[in-house]
Amino acid sequence: MAIKTYKKGTEVQLSTNFKSTEFDCHGSGCCSNTLIDEKLVNYLQKIRNHFGKAVNINSGYRCKTHNTNIGGASKSNHMDGEAADIYINSIKPIEVAQYAESIGILGIGVYSWGIHIDTRTTKYFWYDGGASNVATFGNPSIKEEAPKIDTSKVENKVADPKVMWNYFKSKGLND
């Protein structure tokens, strides 16, 4: 798989349900190309096939200027065409995240409105924008009905006890 460059605004069919323009940077006049990781498109198509509903892309590629203007992370995977913020109408974000993890997606952020996925090679999950990134180990890691986690024992705090990482369990941090 590779990251490909497309001319912003030019529609190219990438898979059965996704077109290049869905990934275009939303910045105005700041860039002319769109970077898209083929692996990301494959993941999104698998998610679309599994749920049988449209996967809406809030944000795909972001050029550096637009990413800075919206307060994006300085090393955001969006700037490399390796990330998408998505939602599926009438599907809980946690359900989409659980499926994303089951198909091998390693970068997953869960928000009230949807999820962030990316093609990073290190396993990272986070919940809501206020939480710190937490490196995780084990599979699967995202649980909807997790026991209450005492986050006072860890440096990186989790925003919601509904999300549990096997790493915490292995360290005895879910008393």
Spans of features found by a protein language model:
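Soluble non-cytosolic domains of exported or imported proteins
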Residues: 34-41, 90-91, 159-162
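Catalytic cores and adjacent binding grooves of peptidoglycan-active enzymes
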Residues: 75-84, 88-157
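Short, low-complexity, charged amphipathic interaction modules
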Residues: 150-175
